[in-house]
Amino acid sequence: MMHTGKVWVGGRRVLLVCPFVSGFVRLTAIAAAIFLALLPQVLSAQAQGFTIEQALGYPYPYGLTTAAHAARIAWVFNSRGSRNVWVADGPGFTGRQVTHYTGDDGMPIASLELTPNGSTVVYARGSETNAQGEVADPTSDVHQPEQQVWAADVSGGEPRLLGTMNCGFEGCEDIQISPDGRYALWSARHALWLAPITGAEPARQLAYIRGDNVQPQWSPDGKSIAFTSDRGAYSLIGIYRFDSRTLQYVDPSVFRDMLPHWSPDGSKLAFIRLTGGEGGFFSGRLQPWTIWVWDAASGTASQIWASTADANGSYPGDEWEGDAFQFAAGNRIVFASQADGWVHLYSIAAAGGAPMLLTPGAFSFQGGVTLTPDGKALLYASNQNDTDRRHIWRVDVDHPGPVALTHGESIEWTPVTAGTAVVCLGSTATTPALPYRVTPQGREPIAASAMPNDYPSAQLVTPQQVVFKSPDGLEIHGQLFVPRSHAQRSPALVFMHGGPPRQMMLGFHPMDAYNFMYAANEYLASRGFVVLSVNYRLSIMYGREFREPAQGGPRGASEYQDIVAAAKYLQALPYVDPQKIGLWGGSYGGYLTALGLARNSDIFKAGVDYAGVHDWSAFFGGGEAAAASDRAKIAYQSSPVASIDKWTSPVLLLQADDDRNVPFSQTVNLVPLLRAHHVPYELTVFPDEVHDSLLWRTWVRVFGATADFFERTLVKGEAIHTVPPEN
């Protein structure tokens, strides 16, 4: 008799066939069959070394902040989807958990603040809303979630609800604590909201004010609020006074005023004025800008500085950090500019005069910028002397000459001061990020015990910095992940980041999505893939001309030649099989993945496209007017759909249907084209998820599916089923 049975082996159900009769012989045969079925996966596991769950199993820290009058820091740990607030006190900085949310619930924490004395943390919990006014619900909970503002005492006790936020765009969370620590102020639903931190009273709307009112700033004496009132084509700087309950606008104009900041004594208010129309690289329009200072005594405002009207003079919005623009000691104003082709820090006297370049050189600053407590110096992160990493630097606000506080084969970002100490977030190539105390000897980890004991740091590889040339001679930087043990001819992958104003580095990344994608590339290397992560033109940290190519993106896709050059670099490596090259990426990286498959299926044999753009012309409004537009025509030719006739390689499409960055319609409209052209594809949709996944388990699925797809297509040579066109 033929005996059959099914058992679960390595997550798959395996059919066992045993041509024996009965008894001990049959049991022995079944045991042998199980062993034989398990053997390939045991060997694979030994070679693989760790799972995708382990690779992503670290706590990711973000939101590092400090108390104004206490040596206390606070941050958020996202541990397998559970986000919680932690604090540590100087000088020892022993980390301890303040909140105790559990489960992979898809509820982000943002805009974490400490009261000035450090006794209470205040934060927003829940996502921003989409165009329909809906907070993200990635767990598909039948109870509609809200984004709310909470406070929790560091000494213990349950968090208390201060009010509803539900702000309407990515990164909109902006909680400001009053100088006396009694009130929290935030912007949401076009208004400014105020609540006592005790939670004794519900949040109330500060005042009726037309427009979309954002960027609130307390005056140093706590008696006034400055803010930006967005009125559509223009915006105003407003000041609300508590004592008189009156509203004043500062030098109203037809331009876009933004980012108000008080002087330390409250006698002046600085702000930025954008004098061009709607700018940005993809618009092709320049964005000149000016700095203005309003004097409280006279009630008048004057322009103290103006950018040039060329490309270098345009407002550096892609890399702007709001805290780079601020009032420092000595009546000086700090700001960022790319006047010399690099995004640098400058300072200028509040009375005007020549600006002072504080950070000269062929590098850029990026990340949080903070003033020292005395207001006389800046702490910031830059890639000075280490192009593909970032370190912490200090510079006086009135004298050029940056001093490195960290260096070496590590990466640091988000510096803050806590008492006399400098604290930052940091990582290495094989160690995920943690908070660190900066010391003269280097850096000391904070809350290192939060790292799982089984985290496979020892099994990760250190990527190699590589530089290769594109066909037009431009130098392109990348990070090459080479498996610890690999076949004589291994399959290889090109990885492209999103953004596109981003930079992948030689270690775990500061941003959450790219932090996880770095871990995914480590995981792919552990599975035997050689991975080349490419900082194609449009990436930051290599100068404005590199970041803003004339024919980039929908204006010609000139960056695509960098992706082909990366593939050819891989094909020339002696340990890479030149016929087994794939590519993958998310968002803009998904666009480049689809473009590679559509234009060069002869080079790229498989791809994973996570939330990519497939038709740039859709952003020009569609219809006859868009079709007749030269810009729309170029945008279409720069799109994957323009080369659909040449697309033959299999693709895995992944996207969330509550994507607030790339319209889900980009995937909806691509699939029928793939079907009509018999392009082999697989599709996974994540209902109610967003662009940068809120659920940890979604990232696990995305990266697990990515590795599985490439193993089936590039390693095993399995054919992906081609879906015939619908009748």
Predicted region positions:
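Serine-hydrolase catalytic core recognition
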Residues: 322, 336, 404, 411-727
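Beta-strand-rich domains and repeat architectures in extracellular enzymes and scaffolds
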Residues: 51-84
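Hydrophobic beta-strand positions that form the internal "hydrophobic ladder"
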Residues: 73, 121, 181-184, 225, ...
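A flexible loop/linker signature enriched in serine peptidases of the S9 family
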Residues: 76-86, 101-108, 123-150, 159-172, ...
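Short loop/turn segments that connect beta-strands within beta-propeller blades
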Residues: 89-93, 153-157, 196-200, 241-245, ...
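Bacterial N-terminal signal peptides
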Residues: 19-22, 26-42
